[in-house]
Amino acid sequence: QPLGQPAQYEPPGREAVFHTENGILNFGESPASGAEDWDLINAGKKAVTLKPGASFFHHADSFAMVRGGHLDVAILGAYEVAQNGDLANWSTGPKGVPAVGGAMDLVHGAKRVAVITGHVTRDGRPKLLERCTLPLTGVGCVTRIYTSLAVIDVADGRFVLREKLPALSIDALQAVTGARLLIPGPV
């Protein structure tokens, strides 16, 4: 679940201002267990903390920020990502319960779209594919993917491997990826 994860891993000495579509700007990491204030939650109903200068605003203002192109990066989860950058993250098909949320606005309003996801499904099927099989959230919108196994860019209709787990061979990674990985040099 990507909601809240980026705020957990902000590098020391660097500052990012995080936005949640339910109306908080500049939230921080998750509070310690037992210290949650359930009036301070993100769009995924996870408790958050506030950083200095945080602000609250109406949901309509939040989506004006999103739709107005004021977000540098949207970080979303995914059921599937295609090598051309297509994203499927709101429906698992006829048997699932669809949940669009604000993802369609985010993929069109943010300057860049990054995905955080497991590399494979619970039953071991690749989530990174030549083409998505599920209903799309956005067409050609994803530029970077952070999976449980690798960091992959989407460029010129290809998956470009940037980083991988050190103990994982490229062949093993390719075997669980549903499209060819381009390896531009040492990884």
What are these language model-derived features?
Residues 1-26:
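N-terminal low-complexity or amphipathic/hydrophobic leaders
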Residues 26-186:
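Conserved phosphate- and dinucleotide-binding cores of soluble alpha/beta proteins
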